[in-house]
């Protein structure tokens, strides 16, 4: 029987103590309210009803650190209370109008959010850990701060990202991970490497897979074009493609020379959900993400149609929208059945950014729940975790370099806009290697410098600069972490060190000795 491996990738960059709105902590609070808590509620309902449809959830280390942070928990509680008050105000304003149903829905949603968060004692990480212990999900890890693996300038820098990600996972989930989400599905094989800007030396470098295997990781995921050739898919919101026929290679389990096993993203199921023109989120009944109430900032309108201007958006009808998710779930499972019929021994890998569901596509979590319920009783397709999917026979494969970004290469993260970013990253990585080797700086200073370097390396900063979504914020953030890093190496005062330790506090186990990788 064909196996279906759903993989959700949950990630947000480090925003704790770095602004509130529109690009700071509120972006995390939105994802907590609209994606992570609703997903936990789905898992709680399925567990209570004995519905078995396992899937894989990647929680990046930097996201797990923030979800577990006391400041973030307190901030989220205040945020959700504020949103409830706004919703109540909207309900009073819109009673007797076409927006009343949406306003009533908003009040109920925020009441449920506060009640659920309180019931969990604010511990979302523990809720996901409980779901894994119950066999509902498989939790996997990633690079510590979502560093872009192929472009990090030194093997030691990539090793520190991987190993810190593994140890952070171990602390939160009390076990060692075997699965790994490659940030941006970006991979580089073993071979000659030349830095895109001045800094690191040229030379032959180990493949990303070799370092993953050394860290105890046994499988990961790549985009379809890395195993089948051809054009890469566009990211969500850009694709205007119709159905694409997968080549046979995407249904195989692949094994690299290092022993790492790899699954490839399935194009058909990807486009059905991600495509802006072809996918489910463009349904006219679903809630419009971009139009917000001018007073409350809440959403009360629907997509209406894909080409509608914001002023043309019609009032949102929650009942009709959530009913539509059932229809779309049946359609998706029908697609899986057709693919399974053509590839009865294959693996259908469907990886998505978790935040697409609930945040960008408000009804998306309800759609996921409907899909899981249908799959639990489906005789043609078996839902499995990625760990189960990679078992058994595999095809020996050599992968090219690439990513799931636009063009299938590194252009989103490496371009004219981001050259200064990479120059600062490489300079800091080289300085960190040297400082770790010399061993002169106090342990606390070196440890905090490592945190600042990890935060500097986050792939979010070049991504946001390239897309223009938050270019000024991204530039401010990477420059801030670079300044902090070099100030620490030059000699920060005890007061300055304490201030940085309070502001940038992830990874208590940060180990500067990881930058001695070659001697290890």
Curated annotation (Swiss-Prot):
Temperature-activity profile: Optimum temperature is 65 degrees Celsius. Remains fully active following incubation for 1 hour at 80 degrees Celsius.
Assigned protein family: Belongs to the glycosyl hydrolase 57 family.
UniProt keywords, alphabetically: Carbohydrate metabolism, Glycogen biosynthesis, Glycogen metabolism, Glycosyltransferase, Transferase
Listed result of changing residue 23 to A: Nearly no effect on enzymatic activity
GO cellular component: extracellular region
GO biological process, one term: alpha-glucan biosynthetic process
Record: active site: 184 (nucleophile), 353 (proton donor)
Name of the protein: 1,4-alpha-glucan branching enzyme TTHA1902
Effect of mutating residue 184 to A: Complete loss of enzymatic activity. Binds amylose but not glycogen
Catalytic activity: Transfers a segment of a (1->4)-alpha-D-glucan chain to a primary hydroxy group in a similar glucan chain
Pathways per UniProt: Glycan biosynthesis; glycogen biosynthesis
Effect of residue 353 to A: Complete loss of enzymatic activity
Activity profile over pH: Optimum pH is 6.5.
Enzyme class: transferase
Outcome after substituting residue 271 to A: Nearly no effect on enzymatic activity
């Amino acid at each position: 029987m064909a196996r279906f491996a759903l993989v959700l990738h949950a990630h947000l960059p480090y925003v704790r103590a770095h602004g509130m709105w529109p690009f700071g902590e509120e972006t995390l609070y939105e994802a907590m309210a609209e994606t992570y808590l609703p997903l936990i509620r789905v898992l709680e309902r399925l567990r209570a009803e004995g519905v078995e449809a396992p899937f894989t959830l990647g929680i990046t280390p930097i996201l797990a650190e923030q979800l577990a942070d006391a400041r973030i928990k307190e901030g989220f509680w205040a945020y959700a209370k504020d949103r409830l008050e706004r919703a109540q105000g909207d309900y009073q304003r819109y009673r007797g109008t076409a927006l009343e149903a949406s306003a009533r829905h908003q009040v109920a949603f925020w009441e449920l959010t506060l009640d659920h968060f309180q019931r969990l004692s604010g511990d979302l990480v523990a809720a996901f850990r409980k779901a894994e212990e119950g066999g509902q999900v498989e939790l996997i890890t990633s690079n510590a701060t979502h560093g872009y693996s192929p472009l990090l300038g030194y093997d030691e820098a990539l090793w520190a990202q991987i190993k810190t990600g593994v140890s952070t996972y171990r602390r939160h989930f009390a076990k060692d991970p075997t699965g790994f989400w490659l940030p941006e599905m970006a991979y580089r094989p073993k071979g000659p490497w030349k830095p895109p800007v001045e800094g690191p030396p040229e030379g032959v470098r180990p493949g990303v897979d070799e370092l993953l295997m050394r860290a105890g990781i046994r499988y990961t995921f790549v985009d379809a074009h890395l195993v089948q050739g051809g054009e890469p898919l566009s990211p969500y919101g850009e694709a205007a493609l119709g159905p694409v026929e997968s080549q046979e290679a995407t249904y195989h389990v692949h094994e690299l020379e290092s022993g790492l096993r790899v699954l490839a993203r399935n194009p058909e199921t990807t486009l059905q959900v991600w495509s802006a023109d072809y996918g489910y989120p463009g349904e006219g009944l679903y809630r419009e993400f971009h139009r917000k109430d001018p007073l409350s900032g809440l959403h009360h309108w629907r997509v209406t149609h894909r080409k509608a201007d914001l002023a043309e958006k019609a009032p949102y009808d929650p009942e009709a929208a959530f009913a539509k998710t059932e229809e779309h779930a049946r359609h998706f499972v029908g697609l899986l059945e057709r693919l399974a019929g053509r590839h009865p021994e294959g693996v259908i890998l469907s990886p998505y950014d978790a935040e697409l569901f609930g945040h960008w596509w408000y009804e998306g979590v309800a759609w996921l729940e409907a899909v899981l319920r249908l799959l639990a009783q489906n005789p043609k397709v078996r839902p499995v975790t990625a760990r189960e999917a990679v078992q058994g026979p595999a095809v020996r494969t050599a992968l090219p370099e690439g990513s799931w970004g636009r063009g299938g290469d590194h252009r989103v993260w490496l371009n004219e806009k981001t050259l200064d970013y990479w120059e600062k990253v490489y300079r800091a990585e080289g300085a960190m290697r040297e400082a770790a080797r010399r061993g002169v700086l106090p342990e606390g200073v070196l440890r905090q410098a490592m945190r600042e370097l990890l935060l500097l390396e986050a792939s979010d900063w070049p991504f946001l600069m390239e897309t223009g979504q938050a270019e000024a914020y991204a530039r401010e953030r990477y420059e801030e972490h670079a300044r902090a890093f070099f100030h620490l190496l030059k000699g920060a005062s005890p007061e300055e060190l304490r201030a940085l330790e309070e502001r940038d506090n992830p990874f208590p186990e940060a180990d500067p000795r990881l930058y001695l990788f070659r001697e290890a």
